[in-house]
Regions:
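Surface-exposed, low-hydrophobicity beta-strand/loop segments enriched in small/polar/acidic residues
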Residues: 1-96
Length: 96
């Protein structure tokens, strides 16, 4: 029997929160977000937006939405992924 296996995982959220647990290392390989006027997403290494959590990536977009496919090994998050979103109806990430 032949088949295809992948170590890719998917997480989706419609509000601020933990996408990948803080106890888990992750490499984001793609990001998609629904479009709305003046949308933004911020991705933090850690458990929130406060002290001790590092802002890794910020994306600002409008009604066109967002599709990012990260080449190579992806964007590394050593202590989980926390999502801070504004205006967008939802965000989906794929990660290993």
């Amino acid at each position: 029997m032949s088949g295809y296996t992948s170590d890719q995982l998917v997480a989706h959220s419609t509000s601020d929160g933990q996408l990948v647990p803080a106890t888990q290392r992750a490499r984001i390989t793609s990001i998609q977000a629904g479009g709305a006027a003046s949308s933004s997403i911020k991705l933090y290494n850690g458990t929130g937006t406060g002290a001790g959590n590092v802002l890794i990536a910020t994306y600002i977009f409008g009604t066109e939405g967002l599709e990012v496919y990260v080449p190579g090994s992806g964007i590394l998050f050593e202590q989980g992924v926390y999502l801070d979103l504004t205006a967008t109806p939802g965000v989906t990430i794929t990660f290993t």
